[in-house]
Each structure stands twice: as structure tokens, then as C-alpha cells.
Amino acid sequence: EVMVSYEQTEKVLFSADAFGKFGAVGTDEPWPEEARRYFINIVGKYGAPVQTLLKKAAALDIATICPLHGPVLQGDLTPYLHLYNTWSSYQPETRGVFIAYASIYGNTKAAAGTGSSKSISVQPNGVRRPQL
């Protein structure tokens, strides 16, 4: 079990597992990539409690977020809060379709790529094993 705390003097939210991420400390990797993976694997099934946390946090003046895992978040916290709201409400970040295909002669591959649209991202991906 974990507990979230807020320190008023320094405006620090100690967020427990919320806003955590995988990865090594001191690397310049973008926060969303490993934070998304962390959310899916660690926090994902607790969407409703995260939504409650976000609603309570909206009433606080937060300057810093200190998760149990990952970097301390400072500066403009809006992108982090927005992504956590999206993830915890189980909404897609972008509209899209993933098409998994296997194509011996290339015809299925060609058909998989025909569904592109300006409003929806289509991501065809071959699942054939690479030749050794």
C-alpha cells in the first residue's frame, strides 16, 4: 500500500506510484515513453483511484511532483497531468488502428497499408519472424 502526501510550504506532491516511470536516473529519454509503460504495468488497473487523485490535486498549488520511481517533475506540470488523466480514464492518446499482418507474397502487406486516413493513424506491422 502507498500514500500520497502534499507538503504545502514547498508545494510538493509526493505521489507514490503515480507519475513514476521506468528507466535509469540521469538519462535524457523523454518522460512519456517509459512513464506510459510504467503506468500500464504498475498503475493501470487503478484508473479510478488515479482519477480521484487528479481531482484532488487540481485544487492544490503543485510546484513539484516526487514519485517513488523515476525523476522529480518540475516546471510546467500540465503535460504530465494531461497524460495521466488520459491514461487513467482509459482513453487513447491518439485515434488509430493497429493492423498486424503476415504476408508471403506482399499482397496482404499492400492491403494492410490501404486503410490510411487523415483523421485516424493506421499502423500496419508485419508479424513474420525475421530470417536467421
Where are these regions (language model features)?
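Metallo-beta-lactamase
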Residues: 1-75
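N-terminal beta1-alpha1-beta2 submodule of the flavodoxin-like/Rossmannoid cofactor-binding fold
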Residues: 76-132
